[in-house]
Amino acid sequence: MIWEIPIIGDFITKPFKAAKLYEFYDRLHLFTVYLLGFFVLLTGAKQHFGNPIDCMLPKQHDDLKSWRDYIHNFCLFYGTFRYDVSNGTSEFGSYTEDASVNYYQWVPFFFAFQVCCFLLPFWCWAYMQKLIYIDMAFIVDYSGKINSEKTFEKTKEKVDRIVNYMHDHFKFRRAHKMGYLSWITFNSAFPSVLYSLTKLFFITNVIIQVNLVCKFLDVDSWTWGFDLLGKFIHPTPRAPEFSSFSDKQRFAAILTDGSYNRFQYFPILVGCEYQLQESVSNFVNHKAQCIIPMNVINEKIFIGLYFWLLVLTALSVIGTVKWILRIKSKKLNEVMIYKLIKKSLEREPFDSNIHDHRYNFVHKYLCADGILLIYFMMDTNGFLKTEEVIGALFKKYCSDAGLEPLQTAPTLTSSPRDLAYSETNYGFAAPQKI
């Protein structure tokens, strides 16, 4: 299968492997990838293995299978045209700019292109995660498996491992700020900035996709979906004198009232003009009446996709605004983390410095990147598993802070030569000589 090809498989599945670092609104875009993939298979199977077009041919052409197959394939890939309806009668038109219908053969490829477009923000976010100094995806994944062990000792061992890993990164975060770029990549706000850019990328992409659908169907207004929905709900009634029409007038009325061509962008009954060489020097033009059964499917798919993209745009904007307000609100972050460490506080004896430890834990120890990580853990693993890990992390922080209170931002030691090495002083304890 294509997934087993090393380069292609990694290129496609990489966003799904990093799918743990998303919130609910981002996973809607991942759902859209699956939805569009299903549309690719559905329309592609109908077009390449089904019966995408049927034409009513003259007897001399229909009797010869080679000619019949040739004409059907020609009309499918070269394109068709709409009927010209005027003055209550219909007649064959021609391949004019307004009448031509030639998008339907590209529908599976268009959906495949959209799949790549929706995967692009996930690919970018998966790459940007490598720029973050802490492996958030590993922490979220490992935290979700802490209760998979059968014994309490094994579970506690897993919790201690992940807590020690997180503690080392948060405690010594600034030890790596030695270069110009490191002041950016090791800044606590850097992961939040990258994730905010990713969310803006999601919004930009879905807005572009709405416009691409309109361009692909050659519609002038982005409200075409509402027009089509209105025709479904309130179809145009037939004229009272329909029963007295001639056959040609009835056929024209059917074309205009929507029984076969409910909406002009998805015509079912079309015409096709083809040329056959019936002798060495004799080329004869023919016109055939055709139906496009796949447009029945395309009509439902595109109207559903149109409204889903509009809903997705609205939800993405709401989710991004909520995310920015949430990550910027000190009060909300404090309340969220206090709930996670509440159980740990109840089990410990009263400490007069606990309020200072709690505040420093949120704003000087976790900072913006730690808070972002906790949001990912809660969205993926739930409250209980996150509570167990963060509660243990807070205990470890307090055990260190109780002996070595964290008061100020770390500074480099002023006399590294006297100490035989240079290190970052975090305010926990004075560095000892070797």
From Swiss-Prot:
A Gene Ontology biological process term: monoatomic ion transmembrane transport
InterPro entries: Innexin
Primary location recorded for the protein, binned into one broad class: membrane
Protein name: Innexin-14
Family: Belongs to the pannexin family.
Keywords assigned by UniProt, alphabetized: Cell junction, Cell membrane, Gap junction, Ion channel, Ion transport, Membrane, Transmembrane, Transmembrane helix, Transport
Pfam families linked: Innexin
Organism the protein comes from: Caenorhabditis elegans
UniProt gene name: inx-14
Task performed by this protein: Structural component of the gap junctions.
